[in-house]
Protein backbone atom coordinates (compact mmCIF):
# COMPACT_ATOMS: atom_id res chain seq x y z
CA UNK A 1 0.00 0.00 0.00
CA UNK A 2 1.00 3.62 -0.54
CA UNK A 3 0.77 6.24 2.16
CA UNK A 4 -1.78 8.48 0.44
CA UNK A 5 -2.18 10.98 3.26
CA UNK A 6 -2.04 14.37 1.54
CA UNK A 7 -1.15 12.83 -1.86
CA UNK A 8 -2.32 14.90 -4.82
CA UNK A 9 -4.42 12.51 -6.93
CA UNK A 10 -6.16 13.31 -10.20
CA UNK A 11 -9.21 11.43 -11.46
CA UNK A 12 -10.42 12.18 -14.97
CA UNK A 13 -14.01 11.01 -15.25
CA UNK A 14 -16.94 11.19 -12.86
CA UNK A 15 -19.01 8.06 -13.42
CA UNK A 16 -19.81 5.25 -10.98
CA UNK A 17 -16.37 3.61 -11.08
CA UNK A 18 -14.63 6.97 -10.72
CA UNK A 19 -16.82 7.88 -7.75
CA UNK A 20 -16.03 4.60 -5.96
CA UNK A 21 -12.32 5.11 -6.48
CA UNK A 22 -12.50 8.77 -5.43
CA UNK A 23 -14.29 7.78 -2.24
CA UNK A 24 -11.69 5.16 -1.29
CA UNK A 25 -8.77 7.47 -2.10
CA UNK A 26 -10.30 10.28 -0.04
CA UNK A 27 -10.93 7.88 2.85
CA UNK A 28 -7.21 7.06 2.84
CA UNK A 29 -6.30 10.75 3.06
CA UNK A 30 -5.60 11.62 -0.58
CA UNK A 31 -6.38 15.09 -1.88
CA UNK A 32 -8.59 14.10 -4.82
CA UNK A 33 -9.25 16.39 -7.77
CA UNK A 34 -11.83 15.22 -10.30
CA UNK A 35 -11.92 16.60 -13.85
CA UNK A 36 -15.14 16.01 -15.81
CA UNK A 37 -17.83 18.24 -17.27
CA UNK A 38 -20.60 16.00 -15.87
CA UNK A 39 -20.88 13.07 -13.50
CA UNK A 40 -22.97 10.68 -11.49
CA UNK A 41 -24.98 11.31 -8.35
CA UNK A 42 -22.40 9.60 -6.12
CA UNK A 43 -19.66 11.96 -7.35
CA UNK A 44 -21.90 14.96 -6.70
CA UNK A 45 -22.40 13.66 -3.17
CA UNK A 46 -18.63 13.41 -2.62
CA UNK A 47 -18.30 17.00 -3.81
CA UNK A 48 -21.10 18.15 -1.49
CA UNK A 49 -19.42 16.39 1.45
CA UNK A 50 -16.13 18.14 0.66
CA UNK A 51 -14.28 14.86 0.04
CA UNK A 52 -13.17 15.88 -3.46
CA UNK A 53 -12.51 18.98 -5.52
CA UNK A 54 -14.45 18.70 -8.77
CA UNK A 55 -13.55 20.88 -11.73
CA UNK A 56 -16.55 20.71 -14.07
CA UNK A 57 -14.68 20.95 -17.37
CA UNK A 58 -12.71 18.83 -19.88
CA UNK A 59 -9.20 17.53 -19.12
CA UNK A 60 -6.14 19.57 -20.11
CA UNK A 61 -2.50 18.47 -20.03
CA UNK A 62 -1.68 20.91 -17.21
CA UNK A 63 -4.14 19.03 -14.96
CA UNK A 64 -1.38 16.43 -14.51
CA UNK A 65 1.15 18.93 -13.12
CA UNK A 66 2.29 18.10 -9.59
CA UNK A 67 0.21 14.96 -9.19
CA UNK A 68 1.37 11.79 -7.46
CA UNK A 69 -1.19 9.61 -9.22
CA UNK A 70 -3.62 9.96 -12.12
CA UNK A 71 -6.59 7.74 -12.87
CA UNK A 72 -8.18 7.84 -16.34
CA UNK A 73 -11.75 6.61 -15.94
CA UNK A 74 -13.71 8.05 -18.83
CA UNK A 75 -15.80 6.37 -21.52
CA UNK A 76 -13.37 7.72 -24.14
CA UNK A 77 -10.60 5.14 -24.72
CA UNK A 78 -8.40 7.55 -26.71
CA UNK A 79 -8.59 10.17 -23.93
CA UNK A 80 -7.76 7.56 -21.29
CA UNK A 81 -4.78 6.45 -23.39
CA UNK A 82 -3.57 10.04 -23.78
CA UNK A 83 -3.87 10.71 -20.04
CA UNK A 84 -1.90 7.54 -19.24
CA UNK A 85 0.82 8.34 -21.80
CA UNK A 86 1.20 11.95 -20.70
CA UNK A 87 1.14 10.99 -17.04
CA UNK A 88 3.92 8.45 -17.53
CA UNK A 89 5.97 11.07 -19.40
CA UNK A 90 5.63 13.33 -16.34
CA UNK A 91 6.69 10.54 -13.97
CA UNK A 92 3.23 10.10 -12.46
CA UNK A 93 1.81 6.73 -11.46
CA UNK A 94 -1.14 6.12 -13.78
CA UNK A 95 -4.14 3.84 -13.99
CA UNK A 96 -6.10 3.56 -17.22
CA UNK A 97 -9.31 1.82 -16.15
CA UNK A 98 -9.90 0.60 -19.70
CA UNK A 99 -6.45 -0.85 -20.46
CA UNK A 100 -4.54 -2.87 -17.86
CA UNK A 101 -1.38 -2.69 -20.00
CA UNK A 102 -1.26 1.06 -19.34
CA UNK A 103 -1.54 0.71 -15.57
CA UNK A 104 1.34 1.29 -13.18
CA UNK A 105 -0.92 -0.08 -10.45
CA UNK A 106 -4.25 -1.85 -10.16
CA UNK A 107 -6.97 -0.46 -7.98
CA UNK A 108 -7.83 -3.19 -5.46
CA UNK A 109 -11.07 -4.07 -3.82
CA UNK A 110 -10.76 -2.82 -0.24
CA UNK A 111 -11.89 -4.62 2.91
CA UNK A 112 -11.40 -2.46 6.00
CA UNK A 113 -12.18 -2.95 9.65
CA UNK A 114 -10.59 -0.48 12.04
CA UNK A 115 -6.84 -0.46 11.44
CA UNK A 116 -6.95 -3.72 9.44
CA UNK A 117 -6.96 -3.12 5.69
CA UNK A 118 -6.87 -5.77 2.95
CA UNK A 119 -6.62 -5.10 -0.76
CA UNK A 120 -7.64 -7.67 -3.37
CA UNK A 121 -6.74 -7.57 -7.04
CA UNK A 122 -6.74 -10.10 -9.86
CA UNK A 123 -4.13 -8.00 -11.72
CA UNK A 124 -6.83 -6.51 -13.91
CA UNK A 125 -7.85 -9.93 -15.25
CA UNK A 126 -11.00 -10.87 -13.32
CA UNK A 127 -12.89 -8.04 -11.63
CA UNK A 128 -15.75 -10.34 -10.59
CA UNK A 129 -13.40 -12.70 -8.74
CA UNK A 130 -11.67 -9.81 -6.97
CA UNK A 131 -15.04 -8.35 -5.94
CA UNK A 132 -16.24 -11.73 -4.63
CA UNK A 133 -13.08 -12.28 -2.56
CA UNK A 134 -13.28 -8.72 -1.22
CA UNK A 135 -16.88 -9.26 -0.08
CA UNK A 136 -15.91 -12.55 1.62
CA UNK A 137 -13.06 -10.77 3.42
CA UNK A 138 -15.43 -8.04 4.60
CA UNK A 139 -17.81 -10.70 5.95
CA UNK A 140 -14.94 -12.48 7.72
CA UNK A 141 -13.69 -9.22 9.25
CA UNK A 142 -17.19 -8.53 10.57
CA UNK A 143 -17.39 -11.97 12.20
CA UNK A 144 -13.97 -11.48 13.80
CA UNK A 145 -15.07 -8.13 15.18
CA UNK A 146 -18.28 -9.56 16.64
CA UNK A 147 -16.44 -12.52 18.24
CA UNK A 148 -14.19 -10.23 20.32
Give the predicted meaning of each segment.
Residues 1-46:
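Hydrophobic, well-ordered beta-alpha structural blocks that scaffold small-molecule cofactor pockets
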Residues 16-17, 77-78, 124:
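Residue-level detector of alpha-helix initiation sites
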Residues 47-62:
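Glycine-rich, highly charged phosphate/nucleotide-binding loops
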Residues 36, 54-58, 98:
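Short loop/edge segments at beta-strand edges and connector loops
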Residues 69-74, 80-106:
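ADP-ribose/adenylate-binding Rossmann-like module
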Residues 32, 54, 91-94:
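Hydrophobic beta-strand scaffold residues
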Residues 8, 68-69:
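Structural motif
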Residues 111-148:
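Adenosine-phosphate binding glycine-rich loop
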Amino acid sequence: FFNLNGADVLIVGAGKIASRRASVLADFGAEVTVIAPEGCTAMRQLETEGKILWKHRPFTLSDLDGRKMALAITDDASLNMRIAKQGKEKGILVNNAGDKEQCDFYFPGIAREGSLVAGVTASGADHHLARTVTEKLKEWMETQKSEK
